[in-house]
């Protein structure tokens, strides 16, 4: 992962689980990281441990604010974006037969719509560099 030195990377879902581990590994590689999530205490813990980590609290279910988030996150990273790791997501404990339409829409908005919009607005930033990477992660941990 040496080729990530000084690369500007956004990681969503960084306040727990896989996202937290991704931030730690990227920091070891020398990347500049913008970690986002909903649990500010966990984000602040990451920031206090690593020099290359900046944080922004953001709830990706707020799809109308995603474009502004990408703008703010890119500005925090100095204006350039090399990669976004779309790691944030949710699951419901209900079986499909018991899931309400509201629960279904929330899962779709967070896991699909927000990932699409994060990627869409990140691409606009990456086009300035004429390169970039988008990594989408889905899992149930």
For each predicted feature, which ranges?
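Conserved glycine-rich cofactor-binding loop
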Residues: 15-16
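Residue(s) in the substrate-gating loop at a strand-loop-helix junction
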Residues: 139
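A short, exposed helix-loop element centered on a Lys and neighboring polar residues
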Residues: 119-120
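Conserved glycine-rich Rossmann-like NAD(P)H-binding loop of the short-chain dehydrogenase/reductase
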Residues: 29-44
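Conserved NAD(P)H cofactor-binding loop of Rossmann-fold oxidoreductase domains
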Residues: 87-92
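Substrate-binding pocket helix/loop in short-chain dehydrogenase/reductase
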Residues: 95-96, 103-108
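The beta1-alpha1 cofactor-binding region of Rossmann-like NAD(H)/NADP(H)-dependent oxidoreductases
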Residues: 58-69, 101
């Amino acid at each position: 992962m040496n080729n990530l030195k000084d690369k500007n990377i956004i990681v969503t879902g960084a306040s727990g689980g896989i996202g937290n581990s991704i931030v730690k590994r990227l920091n070891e590689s020398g990347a500049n990281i913008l970690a986002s999530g909903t649990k500010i205490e966990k984000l602040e813990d990451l920031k206090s441990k690593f020099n290359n980590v900046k944080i922004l609290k953001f709830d990706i279910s707020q799809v109308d604010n995603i474009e502004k988030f990408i703008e703010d996150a890119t500005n925090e990273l100095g204006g350039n974006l090399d990669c976004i790791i779309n790691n944030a997501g949710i699951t419901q404990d209900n079986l499909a037969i018991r899931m309400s339409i509201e629960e279904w829409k929330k899962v779709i908005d967070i896991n699909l719509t927000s990932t699409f919009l994060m990627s869409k607005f990140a691409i606009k930033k990456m086009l300035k560099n004429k390169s970039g990477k988008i990594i989408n992660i889905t899992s149930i941990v």
